[in-house]
C-alpha cells in the first residue's frame, strides 16, 4: 500500500481471514467497497483450514429433518454460485446393501426431491465405477450433489 492508500478511510474492516471473513471481504470488494481484512496469523489457518471440506447436499437429513435438508441445499447452491472456484464437483452416494430394505431408497429419493435436492437412482454397477472401494454386493445406489470445498482457494 502507498502512503495515500493507507490514509484513505476504509468502508469495511473485517477481523479474521477464515472462510467467513475472506468471503465477506470478497463480497464487499466486488460491490465496490474499500475493504481492510485483518488476520492475526495467515489466511485460513484457524478453523477454516482444519475443516473436512465436505459440501453437504443435505440429503443425509432429507427423511428425518426436512428443514435442515432444505437449508443445506440452499447454502450448497449459494456457495457454488458465489465461489465456484472453491468447489470440486464430487457428488455423493447413498448405497443400499443386501441387508437393507430396498423400499427405503424410494422414500429417501422422494424426501430429497421434496427438499429440493437432486437425487438420481443409478445402477449399482455405475456406483461401483464411481467408487471402486464400495461393497460390491450393493443392491441400490442414489447419487446426490455433494461436493468438496478447498478452504485455501
Positions of PLM-derived features:
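Beta1/beta-strand and adjacent pyrophosphate-binding region of the FAD-binding site
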Residues: 4-20, 36
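Short, solvent-exposed loop/helix junctions and linker helices
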Residues: 9, 102, 148-152
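Short beta-strand/turn micro-motifs composed of small residues
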Residues: 16, 39, 96-97
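Glycine-rich FAD pyrophosphate-binding loop
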Residues: 29-50
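Short strand->helix junction
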Residues: 44, 62, 148-149
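Dinucleotide-binding Rossmann-like beta1-alpha1 core, especially the glycine-rich loop
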Residues: 52-126, 130
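Helix-loop-beta segment of a Rossmann-like dinucleotide-binding subdomain
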Residues: 86-94, 128-153
